[in-house]
Amino acid sequence: MNILTPVADRLPSREEAEEALAVLRRWAKHTPVSDVAGLAPDVPALVYPEFSRSYPRNFTVDEAYKASLPDLQNGPASLIVGAKAVIQHVGISNFRLPIRYHTRDNGDLTLETSVTGTVSLEAEKKGINMSRIMRSFYAHAEQGFSFEVIERALEDYKRDLESFDARIQMRFSFPVKVPSLRSGLVGWQYYDIALELVDRGGVRKKIMHLDFVYSSTCPCSLELSEHARRERGQLATPHSQRSVARISVEVRPGKCLWFEDLIELARAAVPTETQVMVKREDEQAFAELNAANPIFVEDAARSFCQALQADPRIGDFRVVASHQESLHSHDAVSVLTEGPTFAAESLDPRLFASLYHTG
């Protein structure tokens, strides 16, 4: 007697299983993911394609392959997420590379530099290819940098990205040899400097930023200390503290302002710059220098202002000063601007916190 095995009870062959899996994958390819998962919980894992897990070291890219790569940032306006609004700045921040700078004494210094490059984005454009900013900048990176070289880099990426406004900012720590007050020792003082080139509405502005660190002795505390000594024979010392001024200046068209020039201008305005190399005679000299130049934060802002106003190479400017009090648990701060370039209704909430120089 012949016994027929029901089809449902027969174990499918490998070929039949492969055919069934191929059918399932064809169906899943054109079916919403939720429907695929709804068929059975383990179906998504079955239909997920197998991929190579080995890095293809010998794979090469030709022009046809590059042309096939998706480019979402240059996609149609229909891909824009959110409001179709103009973005004033979009780009990359803090890409670093060694840059060669020419100094006032005709030397060259290569310094690690942090670069920020941004462009404006029109309301109907999805995005930008940010790597073009780096590629444009790297094309000029071997040159000795100046505002003129920065302009050429900015022109390149503004053209490559088809943007109407653009900006480059370069931050670095600039070393200068500074002599001590009396001992004759010399040490390296490092100054945080940033160069900024802004192209907005077809108008270009060259801007330089300097953080100048100095000591501020409180004039009121100095007088109170002297009163205690004079009236009661009581030894007292005035409070003083490390202080920082962030000086931002617009360099007038056609003018040359060296880093060293701006540093010396700041030092002449407020001579109590913190010291590098110090022996006992230098420490005593610094105490005398502070006593001869007591200064409130208002005085500091106005002293820098007076020096900046007197330099014909400088247009608009801003002084942000912070006296990081040793008497109080708070700081004394001031902001002074001249001209429209730095005028602002609002201040960055972290502006004054960014002025701390911890050494």
Curated annotation (Swiss-Prot):
Pathway: Cofactor biosynthesis; 7,8-dihydroneopterin triphosphate biosynthesis; 7,8-dihydroneopterin triphosphate from GTP: step 1/1. It catalyses: GTP + H2O = 7,8-dihydroneopterin 3'-triphosphate + formate + H(+). GO terms for molecular function: GTP cyclohydrolase I activity. Keywords: Hydrolase. GO terms for biological process: tetrahydrofolate biosynthetic process. The record marks C218 as: May be catalytically important. Its EC number is 3.5.4.16. Belongs to the GTP cyclohydrolase IV family. PANTHER family: GTP CYCLOHYDROLASE MPTA (PTHR36445:SF1). This is GTP cyclohydrolase FolE2. The lineage of its organism: Bacteria, Pseudomonadati, Pseudomonadota, Alphaproteobacteria, Rhodobacterales.
